[in-house]
């Protein structure tokens, strides 16, 4: 089940971020999320904006993501490619799982696709699992964008077929 994140979920979500950071480091992606990233402040901002979600299995929070309306300033400039559309879009950010449930990425993508006609997502060049999940969900590689700290990310977009 996917639902909006509650303030009472913050400890569980922060623990999921810890697990996700450890997974990334163990799988060759040591720099995408430095310690303390995403922060509790970022999570609180996502909750306040109404865009933070959790995935529950048997009443336990096992994953989280932000699903927010665009525009997102890190997508204003794209290199080594282009967005397939300039139509309004929603973004997926801060996707993380505790690794205990299968099909979480597919459920998150399906949730977002039910609510938007155009989606954008980005991930670190070393985050091969997220790149693979994005492609499997029908996203197309769009190019390279730069996040707020100036580091590059591989960007993907998805458009509902007419």
Mark where each language-model region is.
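Conserved acyl-donor/pantetheine-binding loop and adjacent beta-alpha core of acyl/acetyltransferases
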Residues: 66-100
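Conserved GNAT-fold acetyl-CoA-binding loop/helix
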Residues: 21-41
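Conserved acetyl-CoA-binding loop-helix of GNAT-fold acetyltransferases
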Residues: 97-114, 132-136
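Conserved beta-hairpin
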Residues: 49-65
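Conserved GNAT acetyl-CoA-binding A-motif
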Residues: 114-126
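A short beta-loop-alpha structural element at the N-terminal edge
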Residues: 1-15
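C-terminal "cap" of GNAT-fold acetyltransferases
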Residues: 84, 147-162
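Conserved active-site alpha-helix within GNAT-family acetyltransferase domains
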Residues: 106, 126-144, 151
